[in-house]
Each structure stands twice: as structure tokens, then as C-alpha cells.
UniProtKB/Swiss-Prot annotation:
It comes from Orientia tsutsugamushi (strain Ikeda). Its main location: periplasm. PANTHER family: PROTEIN TOLB (PTHR36842:SF1), PROTEIN TOLB HOMOLOG (PTHR36842). NCBIfam families: propeller_TolB (TIGR02800). The keyword Signal applies. It is found in: Periplasm. This is Tol-Pal system protein TolB. Belongs to the TolB family. The keyword ATP-binding does not apply. Residues 1-31 form the signal peptide. Keywords: Cell cycle, Cell division, Periplasm, Signal. Pfam families: PD40, TolB_N. The Tol-Pal system is composed of five core proteins: the inner membrane proteins TolA, TolQ and TolR, the periplasmic protein TolB and the outer membrane protein Pal. They form a network linking the inner and outer membranes and the peptidoglycan layer.
Length: 453
């Protein structure tokens, strides 16, 4: 069983599932001021906030086209959060646009809008534009926030995501995940067999690109903390090597090569170290730390057991990992020197692919029991364990930067006669708001980036 689990972890381990913690901060819709009042949400359910996103004022056709595109992305971002319910523009009563005037709040109240977004776009030179937007509290008739961004025309989509993040932050009190990216392994079929390539895309599936050519088998890609590099394992002539791909320059180089099987590379939070799992002896796997500044390699685990799937805590002082030292596959926590090892899970079943939340309060995992796979979260003291995703073969959770959303992969067959499909899904930490993230082909091993500036 342990051998099978090791193989599974080298294939689809560390996939990204998105976790929403039980608490959201929502706007007190009957407040008389713009003070935000936190509301406790349980079971991932809350009344969605009706929001009207007015078309941004524009003069030229070029500006008008950008206005429509940006508003569409903002609306889509806020809608998939399940916190907001964008109101159709067909219902808008007031037609005046822009940020200079005071809205006719009674007109927006009539269509039940709690929040109103007004904006305008201006071309400032041959390549750049300026967008300004205002977030209004309709009930109190007060301005919540006003911001501007300058951007080149080709970056209109990321600018829209930034605006959505700002709206989410100022209304809910929490940061959003809209201006982020996802890296994963794409798998397609050819006459020569399966082609596995590392792909990268925006969190909504747009701007999809491949960063490897499919000549070599690849697994477990992850972003560097600054989002500039992708760390992954590539098998050339069946020999595994840890490689790093620079997203800015396109340079791709070998970072480390071990005897045996190497997998599950992970960056430290400061980006100066990486952890890898290496199996050079049958049924024995250890975790190693590679210092990227000095090149020194340090073995962190000892003994004759399998130790794999390391995941740093947000401050880098602790490491969650998987081991079979107790006779079953469980999750443990140790310090960054390999000491003070404590067992986190102890219930029936195998626990794999630990992923430490960026908010430092949960560890996500894959559980395998009686042939059934599930995704769950558990507190750092081993309490409050809950399963948040099941059905078919689900694996490899990865956190969004807000610490509330998890991405993961699910393998399934639509019918017994059809081929297996592997797709990406996100879900909040309560197990609600699950949605498929569209990809062109089969997808596994997802990892969520940090927020882009």
C-alpha cells in the first residue's frame, strides 16, 4: 500500500484546492455610515451582496471597448466569489456614468443595489490608460473608497482583476484572489502517447500558456514566493531532476539532481531554500533542504521510513510532511532543522499532500480510506478536522493566497465507456462553493500563485 501511495504522490501530489475559512467580513447593508461590520458566516452560506457595476465612462471607441471588457471581468470575478450578486445592467435606471458626479442613490435603491461601482477610463498617451473607480455604499449614500490605476492596454485584464480585489477588500474586509495565477500539469493524448506539459493561466482560466514542450514527463510545479519562477520535477531519460523556469526570461535550468527518485519540491517562504523528497533506497524516502544561496544540501529526516511531501509554514519555522514511520501514512510536523517531530493525524486511513495555509491556522490534506479519496482541512493542534471535497479521485490541495480557498484535481469517468477526465476545482474551507476551473485539456498538480502587484 505504501509503495502505491508513493507512486500516487509522484503523479498527482500537491494539487490545488481553494479554501474559504468559515468567517467572511461582509458589509452591514443597513449601516448608516461606511463602517464595515463583520458578520459570521457558517457552512459557507451567506446572503450575497447585490452590487451594481456601472459601465465606466469613456470618450473614444478604444476607451469604450476597454470599459466594457474591464467591467465584464470585474463582474465575473465578484460573481464567482459567491459573496456578491452583480445586477444586470438592463435594470439600471440612472444612465449617468463617471466618477465626478454624486449618484442618484434612490435610483440604485429601487433595483436593490447595496453597493455601486462607478468609473472612468482615459487614454493618457500612445500606449497607456488611466482608470479611476469609486465604490459607493448605496444605503448610507457615502463613498467607501476611490482609487486609480495606470496601465498599458495589453494589461487591461490584470487591471480589472486588481479593481475586483480592491472592491472585495473594501467591502468585505478580506483580500481577494482575483489578480493571481495557477500553474498545473496539462495532459493530452497523441499518436506517441500522453503529453504532459506545465501550463500557467489566470485564476479564471484566461491567458493560458505552456512553459514546457511536452518532451519530458513533468510533475508538481509550484510558484516561487515572488511569482517569477516555477519549480518542478522533470524526467529526462527516466532520470528525475529538479528544474526551475524563469517566467520573465524564459531560462530553464537544472537546480538539483539526486540519485533515485526526486519529487515534491517546495520553496521556503523567503524563496532562499527549497525542500525536496528523495528516494535512493527501496521503501526509504527522506526530505532534504537545498540552500539556493550557498548550494548546501541538508538531510532533515532520518530512519528507515518514507518521508515525503514537505510543506513550509508561512514563517518558514516549521514543516508539515508525510511519513509511514508509525506503520500507516500520516502527517507530521517538525521544525525547520528536522527536530521536535509531532504527529498531526492519527485516525484511520492514509493522509498525504499536506498544504499549510498562508494564514497559519489550517493544514489541508488528501485522505485515502478504503479506496476512497477526499480533501480535508485540520487545525495545527489536530482538532477540527473536516472533509470538504469528495467524489471520484480527488487529490493534492493547494491554498489561494487569502487562506480561504483551495484548488485540487478530480479524476472521473462520465460513463464506463469514456476515458478518464482530470479537471481542476476550487472550494471554500467549509466545503461549499465548489466550481470547476476550465482548462483546455486534462489538468492535475495545480498550485496557486501569490497575489500579483
Amino acid at each position: 500500500m505504501i509503495n502505491n501511495l508513493s507512486i500516487s504522490m509522484t503523479k498527482v501530489i500537491k494539487i490545488i484546492l481553494a479554501i474559504i475559512i468559515i468567517l467572511f467580513n461582509t458589509l452591514s447593508i443597513f449601516a448608516n455610515t461606511t463602517t464595515l461590520s463583520p458578520i459570521k458566516i457558517t457552512k459557507g452560506n451567506c446572503t450575497q451582496i447585490p452590487i451594481a457595476i456601472n459601465f465606466f465612462a469613456a470618450k473614444s471607441n478604444e476607451e469604450h471597448g476597454l470599459s466594457q471588457n474591464i467591467v465584464s471581468i470585474i463582474s465575473n470575478d465578484l460573481n464567482i466569489s459567491k459573496i456578491f450578486a452583480p445586477i444586470s445592467s438592463d435594470l439600471f435606471i440612472e444612465t449617468e456614468q463617471g466618477v465626478a458626479h454624486i449618484p442618484l442613490f434612490t435610483a440604485w435603491s429601487q433595483i436593490n443595489a447595496n453597493i455601486l461601482i462607478n468609473g472612468e477610463i482615459t487614454k493618457i498617451d500612445s500606449t497607456d490608460f488611466k482608470v479611476t473607480f469609486v465604490v459607493w455604499d448605496v444605503f448610507s449614500a457615502k463613498e467607501i473608497t476611490r482609487k486609480s490605476f495606470t496601465f498599458p492596454s495589453q494589461l487591461w485584464r490584470s487591471t480589472a482583476h486588481k479593481i475586483a480585489d480592491q472592491i472585495y477588500k473594501h467591502v468585505t474586509g478580506s483580500k481577494g484572489n482575483f489578480n493571481t495565477k495557477i500553474v498545473y500539469v496539462s495532459e493530452s493524448n497523441s499518436s506517441k502517447g500522453k503529453i504532459r506539459r506545465i501550463a500557467i493561466m489566470d485564476q479564471d482560466g484566461a491567458n493560458h500558456n505552456y512553459i514546457t514542450n511536452g518532451k519530458n514527463h513533468v510533475i508538481t510545479p509550484v510558484f516561487s514566493p515572488n511569482n517569477n519562477q516555477i519549480l518542478y520535477v522533470s524526467y529526462h531519460n527516466k532520470i528525475p531532476t529538479v528544474r526551475i523556469h524563469d517566467l520573465n526570461s524564459g531560462n530553464n535550468k537544472i537546480l538539483a539532481s539526486f540519485n533515485g527518485i526526486t519529487f515534491s519540491p517546495r520553496f521556503s517562504p523567503d524563496g532562499n531554500k527549497i525542500l525536496v523528497s528523495n528516494s535512493s533506497t527501496k521503501n526509504v524516502t527522506h526530505i532534504y533542504e537545498i540552500n539556493l544561496l550557498t548550494g548546501k544540501i541538508k538531510q532533515l529526516t532520518k530512519g528507515q521510513s518514507i518521508n515525503t511531501s514537505p510543506s513550509y509554514s508561512p514563517d518558514g519555522s516549521k514543516i508539515a510532511f508525510v511519513s509511514d514511520r508509525s506503520g500507516s501514512t500520516q502527517i507530521y510536523i517538525m521544525n525547520d532543522q528536522g527536530g521536535n517531530i509531532k504527529r498531526l493525524t492519527s485516525q484511520p486511513g492514509a493522509y498525504t499532500t499536506p498544504a499549510w495555509s498562508p494564514t497559519n491556522n489550517y493544514i489541508a490534506f488528501t485522505k485515502i480510506e478504503a479506496g476512497e479519496f477526499s480533501i480535508g482541512v485540520i487545525k495545527l493542534d489536530g482538532s477540527n478536522k473536516r472533509i470538504i471535497a469528495t467524489k471520484h479521485l480527488v487529490e493534492g490541495p493547494s491554498w489561494a493566497p487569502d487562506g480561504k480557498t483551495i484548488i485540487f484535481s478530480r479524476a472521473y469517468k462520465a460513463t464506463k465507456s469514456t476515458s478518464t477526465k482530470v479537471k481542476l476545482y476550487s472550494v471554500d474551507c467549509t466545503g461549499y462553493n465548489e466550481r470547476e476551473i476550465q482548462t483546455p485539456e486534462n489538468a492535475s498538480d495545480p498550485n496557486w500563485s501569490n497575489e500579483y502587484e
